[in-house]
Amino acid sequence: KGLSLALPFDSLFVYGEVLQDKNVPELEYADYMGQTASAYGHVLRDALAKGSFNGLDIADWRHQAAPEFLTTWVESHDTYCNAHESAGLSDNQIRTGWVFLTARQNGTPLFFSRPMGSTRSNYWGDNVIGARGNDEFFHPEVVAVNKFRQAMKGQKEDLQFNPEGTVAVVNRGKKG
């Protein structure tokens, strides 16, 4: 009786996709599971769309839970396929956001692979349940920052920004 998993629980990545909104009891959920920093993703997409983070605090996770327990993303299936909020961002803009997000110390970043063959007039592309999305997760920028994140594990972050809001640098500890 009970739940039987093919893999031990501690080898799985389990989080609560609790999307932020007013009246969502984030601190209460935090007692039970990591959560999604969906409001942070919105601010990041806003900066990418504007080409500047002037007037936006892209250092603040915008969540009541501790940042080490947050799941982060630039976009999700909801923001791309359902609401189309992020659909206007180019692959290059998404990768730029991914590099900044993934280089940071906290949060567990998830990369949304847009459906293969998707366009701005056909968001779902060739999508079928279980099919792999596009190849963006193989892009050298994505691969490099994923390796950087692993190499910098445990190193504190130091974020630097230029006054114009067009350059952000993530320094990590003494190694990167």
Task: List each model region and its residues.
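Active-site-proximal helices and loops of the catalytic beta/alpha 8
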Residues: 1-176
